Protein backbone atom coordinates (compact mmCIF):
# COMPACT_ATOMS: atom_id res chain seq x y z
CA UNK A 1 0.00 0.00 0.00
CA UNK A 2 1.41 3.38 -0.98
CA UNK A 3 1.52 6.36 1.38
CA UNK A 4 -1.16 8.03 -0.71
CA UNK A 5 -3.38 4.96 -0.49
CA UNK A 6 -2.82 4.44 3.22
CA UNK A 7 -3.92 7.95 4.13
CA UNK A 8 -6.76 8.36 1.63
CA UNK A 9 -10.26 8.83 3.00
CA UNK A 10 -12.16 5.84 1.66
CA UNK A 11 -15.64 6.63 2.93
CA UNK A 12 -18.37 7.59 0.51
CA UNK A 13 -20.48 10.74 0.83
CA UNK A 14 -23.85 10.14 2.43
CA UNK A 15 -25.53 11.03 -0.84
CA UNK A 16 -23.58 8.43 -2.83
CA UNK A 17 -25.41 5.36 -4.04
CA UNK A 18 -25.10 2.34 -1.75
CA UNK A 19 -24.18 -1.09 -3.07
CA UNK A 20 -26.40 -4.12 -2.58
CA UNK A 21 -24.65 -7.36 -3.35
CA UNK A 22 -26.42 -10.70 -3.29
CA UNK A 23 -25.06 -14.14 -4.14
CA UNK A 24 -26.71 -17.55 -4.08
CA UNK A 25 -24.69 -20.73 -4.54
CA UNK A 26 -25.93 -24.31 -4.62
CA UNK A 27 -23.81 -27.47 -4.71
CA UNK A 28 -25.02 -30.98 -5.53
CA UNK A 29 -23.38 -34.37 -5.75
CA UNK A 30 -23.41 -36.10 -9.13
CA UNK A 31 -21.83 -39.50 -8.78
CA UNK A 32 -18.53 -38.86 -7.04
CA UNK A 33 -18.36 -35.21 -8.13
CA UNK A 34 -19.44 -32.11 -6.19
CA UNK A 35 -20.85 -29.66 -8.73
CA UNK A 36 -21.83 -26.01 -8.48
CA UNK A 37 -25.32 -26.31 -9.96
CA UNK A 38 -26.84 -22.98 -8.95
CA UNK A 39 -25.44 -19.47 -8.95
CA UNK A 40 -27.41 -16.26 -8.83
CA UNK A 41 -25.90 -12.85 -8.27
CA UNK A 42 -27.09 -9.30 -7.91
CA UNK A 43 -24.71 -6.37 -7.74
CA UNK A 44 -20.98 -6.73 -7.21
CA UNK A 45 -20.76 -10.19 -5.58
CA UNK A 46 -19.48 -12.97 -7.86
CA UNK A 47 -18.06 -16.47 -7.75
CA UNK A 48 -15.14 -17.53 -9.88
CA UNK A 49 -15.03 -20.71 -11.94
CA UNK A 50 -15.03 -23.78 -9.66
CA UNK A 51 -11.74 -25.63 -9.30
CA UNK A 52 -10.93 -29.23 -8.35
CA UNK A 53 -7.35 -29.32 -7.02
CA UNK A 54 -8.28 -32.26 -4.75
CA UNK A 55 -10.17 -34.26 -7.35
CA UNK A 56 -13.84 -34.41 -8.32
CA UNK A 57 -15.16 -34.94 -4.81
CA UNK A 58 -14.16 -31.51 -3.45
CA UNK A 59 -15.28 -28.32 -5.20
CA UNK A 60 -13.24 -25.17 -4.51
CA UNK A 61 -14.95 -21.83 -5.13
CA UNK A 62 -13.64 -18.29 -4.66
CA UNK A 63 -16.15 -15.56 -3.77
CA UNK A 64 -15.13 -12.11 -4.99
CA UNK A 65 -16.45 -8.63 -4.25
CA UNK A 66 -15.05 -6.46 -7.07
CA UNK A 67 -15.40 -3.03 -5.39
CA UNK A 68 -13.01 -4.36 -2.76
CA UNK A 69 -14.69 -2.71 0.20
CA UNK A 70 -17.98 -2.07 1.98
CA UNK A 71 -19.18 1.44 2.85
CA UNK A 72 -22.03 2.79 4.98
CA UNK A 73 -25.41 1.79 3.56
CA UNK A 74 -23.98 -1.16 1.61
CA UNK A 75 -25.50 -4.59 2.13
CA UNK A 76 -24.06 -8.00 1.25
CA UNK A 77 -26.19 -11.17 1.33
CA UNK A 78 -24.79 -14.66 0.77
CA UNK A 79 -26.98 -17.77 0.70
CA UNK A 80 -25.10 -21.02 0.19
CA UNK A 81 -26.51 -24.55 0.13
CA UNK A 82 -24.47 -27.75 0.11
CA UNK A 83 -26.53 -30.74 -0.96
CA UNK A 84 -26.31 -34.15 0.69
CA UNK A 85 -22.89 -35.77 0.40
CA UNK A 86 -21.13 -32.77 -1.14
CA UNK A 87 -17.83 -31.21 -0.09
CA UNK A 88 -17.13 -27.54 -0.81
CA UNK A 89 -14.18 -25.31 0.05
CA UNK A 90 -15.13 -21.63 -0.03
CA UNK A 91 -12.71 -18.74 0.31
CA UNK A 92 -12.08 -15.15 -0.78
CA UNK A 93 -9.04 -13.67 -2.56
CA UNK A 94 -8.36 -10.86 -0.10
CA UNK A 95 -9.49 -9.04 3.00
CA UNK A 96 -12.97 -7.52 3.10
CA UNK A 97 -12.44 -3.82 3.82
CA UNK A 98 -15.07 -1.98 5.86
CA UNK A 99 -14.70 1.73 5.17
CA UNK A 100 -15.21 4.75 7.40
CA UNK A 101 -18.92 5.24 8.01
CA UNK A 102 -20.86 7.94 6.20
CA UNK A 103 -23.50 7.87 8.94
CA UNK A 104 -25.02 4.55 7.89
CA UNK A 105 -24.24 0.98 8.93
CA UNK A 106 -22.71 -1.43 6.43
CA UNK A 107 -24.31 -4.86 6.75
CA UNK A 108 -23.46 -8.43 5.82
CA UNK A 109 -25.62 -11.55 6.15
CA UNK A 110 -24.29 -15.03 5.46
CA UNK A 111 -26.50 -18.12 5.60
CA UNK A 112 -24.97 -21.53 4.86
CA UNK A 113 -26.87 -24.82 4.85
CA UNK A 114 -24.85 -28.03 4.89
CA UNK A 115 -26.80 -31.12 3.87
CA UNK A 116 -26.67 -34.61 5.36
CA UNK A 117 -23.19 -36.19 5.23
CA UNK A 118 -21.85 -33.04 3.52
CA UNK A 119 -18.57 -31.31 4.37
CA UNK A 120 -17.78 -27.59 4.40
CA UNK A 121 -14.50 -25.70 4.66
CA UNK A 122 -15.35 -22.00 5.09
CA UNK A 123 -12.00 -20.21 4.83
CA UNK A 124 -12.48 -16.52 4.01
CA UNK A 125 -9.79 -13.91 4.30
CA UNK A 126 -10.12 -11.47 7.18
CA UNK A 127 -12.34 -8.47 7.83
CA UNK A 128 -10.40 -5.19 7.98
CA UNK A 129 -12.27 -2.40 9.74
CA UNK A 130 -11.07 1.10 8.92
CA UNK A 131 -11.16 3.79 11.58
CA UNK A 132 -14.76 4.91 12.25
CA UNK A 133 -16.30 1.95 10.41
CA UNK A 134 -19.81 0.94 11.51
CA UNK A 135 -20.85 -2.59 10.59
CA UNK A 136 -23.47 -5.24 11.37
CA UNK A 137 -22.54 -8.85 10.62
CA UNK A 138 -24.82 -11.90 10.78
CA UNK A 139 -23.66 -15.48 10.19
CA UNK A 140 -25.79 -18.65 10.35
CA UNK A 141 -24.61 -22.20 9.66
CA UNK A 142 -27.12 -25.06 9.58
CA UNK A 143 -25.75 -28.61 9.75
CA UNK A 144 -27.61 -31.62 8.38
CA UNK A 145 -27.42 -35.11 9.85
CA UNK A 146 -23.83 -36.42 10.02
CA UNK A 147 -22.51 -33.24 8.35
CA UNK A 148 -19.25 -31.57 9.33
CA UNK A 149 -17.86 -28.07 8.95
CA UNK A 150 -14.71 -26.11 9.71
CA UNK A 151 -14.52 -22.35 9.36
CA UNK A 152 -13.30 -19.12 10.81
CA UNK A 153 -13.86 -15.42 11.24
CA UNK A 154 -10.88 -13.09 11.61
CA UNK A 155 -10.93 -9.36 12.38
CA UNK A 156 -8.37 -6.56 12.27
CA UNK A 157 -9.19 -3.23 13.91
CA UNK A 158 -7.65 -0.37 11.97
CA UNK A 159 -5.11 -0.28 9.16
CA UNK A 160 -1.89 -1.03 10.99
CA UNK A 161 0.21 -0.11 7.95
CA UNK A 162 -1.32 3.39 8.06
CA UNK A 163 -0.88 3.75 11.82
CA UNK A 164 -4.61 3.52 12.55
CA UNK A 165 -5.69 2.43 16.01
CA UNK A 166 -9.46 2.21 15.37
CA UNK A 167 -10.24 5.19 17.60
CA UNK A 168 -13.91 5.32 16.57
CA UNK A 169 -16.46 2.87 15.22
CA UNK A 170 -18.83 0.05 16.13
CA UNK A 171 -19.19 -3.61 15.13
CA UNK A 172 -22.36 -5.57 15.88
CA UNK A 173 -21.99 -9.28 15.18
CA UNK A 174 -24.12 -12.37 15.54
CA UNK A 175 -23.04 -15.94 14.77
CA UNK A 176 -24.95 -19.17 15.27
CA UNK A 177 -24.57 -22.85 14.44
CA UNK A 178 -27.72 -25.00 14.42
CA UNK A 179 -28.24 -28.74 14.00
CA UNK A 180 -30.46 -30.68 11.60
CA UNK A 181 -33.50 -30.06 13.82
CA UNK A 182 -32.90 -26.32 14.05
CA UNK A 183 -31.59 -26.45 17.61
CA UNK A 184 -28.78 -24.00 18.40
CA UNK A 185 -25.42 -25.69 18.94
CA UNK A 186 -23.56 -22.44 19.56
CA UNK A 187 -24.57 -18.81 19.34
CA UNK A 188 -22.75 -15.59 20.06
CA UNK A 189 -23.86 -11.98 19.92
CA UNK A 190 -21.43 -9.11 20.43
CA UNK A 191 -21.36 -5.33 20.20
CA UNK A 192 -17.88 -3.86 20.11
CA UNK A 193 -17.45 -0.10 20.36
CA UNK A 194 -14.09 1.55 19.77
CA UNK A 195 -14.19 2.92 23.33
CA UNK A 196 -15.29 -0.35 24.97
CA UNK A 197 -13.12 -1.09 28.04
CA UNK A 198 -13.04 -4.75 26.96
CA UNK A 199 -10.61 -3.81 24.21
CA UNK A 200 -7.91 -3.37 26.83
CA UNK A 201 -9.17 -5.78 29.49
CA UNK A 202 -7.43 -9.11 30.07
CA UNK A 203 -10.78 -10.90 29.84
CA UNK A 204 -11.43 -9.16 26.52
CA UNK A 205 -9.04 -8.27 23.69
CA UNK A 206 -6.16 -7.44 26.06
CA UNK A 207 -5.03 -4.62 23.79
CA UNK A 208 -4.57 -6.82 20.72
CA UNK A 209 -5.74 -5.29 17.40
CA UNK A 210 -6.41 -8.66 15.73
CA UNK A 211 -8.74 -11.41 16.91
CA UNK A 212 -10.69 -14.33 15.55
CA UNK A 213 -12.66 -17.51 16.15
CA UNK A 214 -12.17 -20.83 14.40
CA UNK A 215 -15.01 -23.30 14.74
CA UNK A 216 -15.22 -26.99 13.94
CA UNK A 217 -18.49 -28.92 14.00
CA UNK A 218 -19.16 -32.61 13.58
CA UNK A 219 -19.23 -35.94 15.36
CA UNK A 220 -15.47 -35.87 16.01
CA UNK A 221 -15.61 -32.49 17.76
CA UNK A 222 -15.55 -33.47 21.41
CA UNK A 223 -13.78 -32.56 24.63
CA UNK A 224 -10.85 -34.86 23.86
CA UNK A 225 -10.22 -33.07 20.56
CA UNK A 226 -10.39 -29.68 22.28
CA UNK A 227 -7.93 -30.84 24.95
CA UNK A 228 -5.47 -32.07 22.34
CA UNK A 229 -5.65 -28.70 20.60
CA UNK A 230 -5.42 -26.71 23.83
CA UNK A 231 -2.17 -28.41 24.76
CA UNK A 232 -0.41 -26.83 21.78
CA UNK A 233 -2.03 -23.41 21.75
CA UNK A 234 0.49 -20.52 21.83
CA UNK A 235 0.31 -17.90 24.56
CA UNK A 236 2.84 -15.07 24.35
CA UNK A 237 3.08 -11.35 23.65
CA UNK A 238 2.33 -11.74 19.93
CA UNK A 239 -0.23 -14.57 19.81
CA UNK A 240 -2.60 -15.95 22.41
CA UNK A 241 -5.00 -18.81 21.73
CA UNK A 242 -7.20 -21.29 23.49
CA UNK A 243 -9.44 -24.19 22.50
CA UNK A 244 -12.64 -25.47 24.08
CA UNK A 245 -15.54 -27.79 23.38
CA UNK A 246 -18.59 -25.58 23.95
CA UNK A 247 -21.05 -28.44 23.42
CA UNK A 248 -20.72 -32.00 22.11
CA UNK A 249 -20.11 -31.57 18.40
CA UNK A 250 -18.60 -28.06 18.43
CA UNK A 251 -15.00 -27.04 19.17
CA UNK A 252 -13.87 -23.40 19.17
CA UNK A 253 -10.39 -21.90 18.91
CA UNK A 254 -10.17 -18.27 20.08
CA UNK A 255 -7.13 -16.25 19.10
CA UNK A 256 -5.66 -12.80 19.76
CA UNK A 257 -2.68 -11.51 17.78
CA UNK A 258 -0.55 -8.48 17.10
CA UNK A 259 -0.77 -9.05 13.33
CA UNK A 260 -3.18 -10.66 10.90
CA UNK A 261 -0.35 -12.68 9.36
CA UNK A 262 0.31 -14.39 12.71
CA UNK A 263 -3.37 -15.18 13.25
CA UNK A 264 -3.79 -16.53 9.72
CA UNK A 265 -0.78 -18.82 10.12
CA UNK A 266 -2.22 -20.12 13.38
CA UNK A 267 -5.69 -20.74 11.93
CA UNK A 268 -4.15 -22.48 8.92
CA UNK A 269 -2.15 -24.76 11.22
CA UNK A 270 -5.33 -25.56 13.18
CA UNK A 271 -7.25 -26.31 9.98
CA UNK A 272 -4.48 -28.58 8.70
CA UNK A 273 -4.66 -30.51 11.98
CA UNK A 274 -8.45 -30.59 12.24
CA UNK A 275 -9.49 -31.47 8.70
CA UNK A 276 -8.30 -35.11 8.73
CA UNK A 277 -10.12 -35.62 12.03
CA UNK A 278 -13.35 -33.68 11.42
CA UNK A 279 -13.84 -34.42 7.69
CA UNK A 280 -11.61 -37.50 7.38
CA UNK A 281 -10.00 -35.77 4.41
CA UNK A 282 -6.32 -34.90 4.05
CA UNK A 283 -5.46 -31.21 4.26
CA UNK A 284 -3.09 -29.13 2.15
CA UNK A 285 -2.72 -25.33 2.12
CA UNK A 286 -4.89 -23.72 -0.55
CA UNK A 287 -3.05 -22.65 -3.69
CA UNK A 288 -4.74 -19.25 -3.45
CA UNK A 289 -2.96 -18.62 -0.14
CA UNK A 290 0.40 -19.14 -1.82
CA UNK A 291 -0.09 -16.48 -4.54
From Swiss-Prot:
Keywords: Chaperone, Cytoplasm, Nickel insertion
KW Cytoplasm (keyword) present: yes
Transmembrane segments: none
Coarse class of the protein's main subcellular location: cytoplasm
Reported function: Required for maturation of urease via the functional incorporation of the urease nickel metallocenter.
Family listed: Belongs to the UreD family.
Quaternary data: UreD, UreF and UreG form a complex that acts as a GTP-hydrolysis-dependent molecular chaperone, activating the urease apoprotein by helping to assemble the nickel containing metallocenter of UreC. The UreE protein probably delivers the nickel.
PANTHER family: UREASE ACCESSORY PROTEIN D
Protein name: Urease accessory protein UreD
Organism annotation: Burkholderia vietnamiensis (strain G4 / LMG 22486) (Burkholderia cepacia (strain R1808))
Gene label: ureD
